[in-house]
Amino acid sequence: MNKILLQCDNLCKRYQEGTVQTDVLHDVSFSIGEGEMMAIVGSSGSGKSTLLHLLGGLDTPTSGDVIFSGQPMSKLSSAAKAELRNQKLGFIYQFHHLLPDFTALENVAMPLLIGKKKPAEIDARAREMLHAVGLEHRATHRPSELSGGERQRVAIARALVNNPRLVLADEPTGNLDARNADSIFELLGELNRLQGTAFLVVTHDLQLAKRMSRQLEMRDGRLTAELSLMGAE
């Protein structure tokens, strides 16, 4: 079994507005190993996106903790969490969130700029990642000049440009047609093999989830089962 990379222990998340309390996550516990490909499957409103926000240090659990590479996130300062997100974690969303006034190359380079890498290293690595996703010929194009599938490929290149140990993906193919969705998941698998990056993908699509090596089901804020989707149709 792969060495544990990320572990969450009894995560709970509750929101309160006035006297109204809403429990979104209930005692969620699981782990993901180095280089593992995992899917969390659930319908809209099941708590999947909230879970990813907690795992990425973008929000704080009401109780429980997230442990990344042996280090509890509850012990990290805001600055340390930001550095962790820049250096060790990658994020892919249903919407690409590319900066519209920047080229594909500049968008991919952004995490390296934030990390204050040297200019020559930034350019070389950003071009390397565009090549990895098959878009080196679109380096100077802005998002408005790219197709939906191309924009998502640029977003994936940006998420992986710092060679993170784990990528958190929230419905990464939700805005794509079947052909482009299939292409994106093929790409994630290839990058996993080439870079050893672990992927945690949340999705409602069983056909996409079954491509991952492990699948968990989330329902009403609880992880209810480990799924076997080899025969999913």
Swiss-Prot record:
SMART domains linked: AAA (SM00382)
Chief localisation class: membrane
Binding positions for ATP per the UniProt entry: G42, S43, S44, G45, S46, G47, K48, S49
Group of enzyme by EC: translocase
Location relative to the cell: Cell inner membrane
One Gene Ontology molecular-function label: transmembrane transporter activity
Gene3D superfamilies: P-loop containing nucleotide triphosphate hydrolases (3.40.50.300)
PROSITE patterns given in the database record: ABC_TRANSPORTER_1, ABC_TRANSPORTER_2, LOLD
Alphabetical keyword list: ATP-binding, Cell inner membrane, Cell membrane, Membrane, Nucleotide-binding, Translocase, Transport
Subunit structure: The complex is composed of two ATP-binding proteins (LolD) and two transmembrane proteins (LolC and LolE).
Annotated protein name in UniProt: Lipoprotein-releasing system ATP-binding protein LolD
Gene behind the chain: lolD
